[in-house]
Amino acid sequence: MEAQGQENIVNLLRCAWAGSQKYGALVWSGDIDSSFRALRNQLAAGLNMGIAGIPWWTTDIGGFHGGNIHDDAFKECFVRWFAFGAFCPVMRLHGFREPFKAPLGTTGGGKHISGAENEVWSYGEEVYGICKKYMELREKMRRM
């Protein structure tokens, strides 16, 4: 990429090793489940990325697989994960949420189910208010 004149190269990757930062590695932990256990594991994953010298890493806030946007227990997990994500090098909200939507069509990609909305306002006013505070805090820190 550099030979083609690209600068500030960033590659979103599922795996990396010590020295990968030389190649613009931005590592995320892959498609993990939506649970408090998976959130706890992200703390260790982030520490290991730092130990390996890889400064750019992220996690799917709220996990990727599962998590019903109407379930209070998942909302709590999501909010705590969002708070953690606000202090990660890259803040990334991504996931395949429940309840699933019916397929849009009968051919190609349209024949597959789709996940529920996953924007911060999709979880209700209370969750949105908390997430908004963390987004504002992150923006304040970014400007420092």
Where are these regions (language model features)?
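Catalytic-domain carbohydrate-binding cleft regions of carbohydrate-active enzymes
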Residues: M1-M144
